[in-house]
């Protein structure tokens, strides 16, 4: 009798495992790197966690956004690895913790697997920004005269020289980041055109 029960138990486990295996399918391939339906479901969950307004978004629209995100991430990761860009976890751990705290503040419960995925996203974004900065920082020019003019139009300009310089540096960094964001989109678009992307 015990042998029969053990056999039935093993059979159930095998069938359950088989069902799970069957459910994993490829939805896209990027330069021989596969993106599965599980990756897609997790990405949709992350999108909903990061922006609760997306909970009411049409499923097909969400899937399109999610698959595009996943493709972009694969391309970014391949480019980062190719250029040997590496950042220590401590570089972005505070940013990650603040992001998780802001999500959980809305009442969203994030499971450990999704937290890990969000951590990897934050890491990827920081390493990608490092790559773009390294490649294009010499192409980024900020017109200081425009910054000076903008400061003149600003209400409550600091009278303290140190505070004024800090504000000026902040505005310069905002402009630099805007221009680097443009280069980021151009660079991603360029590598996307050179890549083999297949949908299933």
PLM feature spans:
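Sec-dependent N-terminal signal peptides
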Residues: 4-13
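Boundary at the C-terminal end of the N-terminal hydrophobic targeting segment
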Residues: 16-20
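Peptidyl-prolyl cis-trans isomerase
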Residues: 21-25, 29, 56-200
């Amino acid at each position: 009798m015990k042998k029969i029960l053990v056999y039935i138990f093993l059979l159930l486990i095998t069938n359950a495992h088989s069902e799970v295996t069957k459910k994993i399918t490829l939805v896209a391939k990027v330069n021989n790197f596969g993106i599965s339906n599980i990756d897609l479901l997790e990405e949709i969950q992350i999108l909903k966690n990061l922006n609760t307004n997306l909970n009411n978004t049409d499923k097909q629209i969400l899937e399109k956004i999610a698959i595009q995100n996943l493709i972009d991430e694969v391309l970014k990761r391949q480019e980062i690895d190719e250029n040997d860009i590496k950042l220590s976890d401590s570089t972005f751990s505070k940013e990650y913790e603040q992001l998780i705290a802001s999500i959980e503040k809305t009442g969203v419960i994030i499971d450990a697997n999704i937290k890990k995925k969000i951590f990897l996203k934050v890491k990827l974004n920081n390493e990608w920004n490092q790559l773009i900065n390294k490649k294009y920082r010499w192409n980024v020019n900020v017109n200081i005269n425009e910054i000076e003019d903008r400061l003149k139009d600003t209400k409550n300009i600091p009278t303290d020289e140190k505070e004024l310089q800090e504000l000026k540096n902040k505005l310069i960094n905002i402009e630099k980041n805007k221009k680097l964001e443009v280069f980021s989109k151009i660079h991603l678009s360029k590598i996307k055109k050179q890549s083999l992307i297949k949908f299933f």
